[in-house]
Amino acid sequence: MVKVMVVAEVRPSEDVNKVLSAISNFFDFEKMNTRKEGIIDILVLEARTLKSLLKFHRVLRNERILDSARKYLMKGIEGNTIAFMIHKQAAAVGVLSFVDSDKESPLGAIKFYIEYQNPKEIVDWLAPKTAHGVPLWDNPVPPDV
């Protein structure tokens, strides 16, 4: 079973539609929930298919950041989950920039969680190893089982 979840804070100075637009540059969600934590709204977006990450897959290649993406994705594997964060302001202008901590994105990072039976298979699809910047393989989207 596949579950892709994206979590982002919407602070009082931010427009929820702009945060949704930033996320939508990389992720096609099926379901959205919002909860309140003090004065901050928390967006929780979900999808049950890896095809929801096709934009993310394409951007990794267009921006030529497969090697750094692979490093962040591999580092984020724990059990059957991959967790990583991207810079919210960069995402708002369509640029993918990974961050190590929430503090690196002043308005909070966008957090991705991908649950899958074999997380390494997802990493190999999204960000394959490269030689001189060229992917060594181009795997199809793993099946949503």
Curated annotation (Swiss-Prot):
Pfam families: RNA_binding (PF01877). Transmembrane segments: none annotated. InterPro entries: PAB1135-like (IPR002739), Ribosomal_uL5_dom_sf (IPR022803). Belongs to the UPF0201 family. HAMAP family: UPF0201. This is UPF0201 protein SSO1042. It comes from Saccharolobus solfataricus (strain ATCC 35092 / DSM 1617 / JCM 11322 / P2).
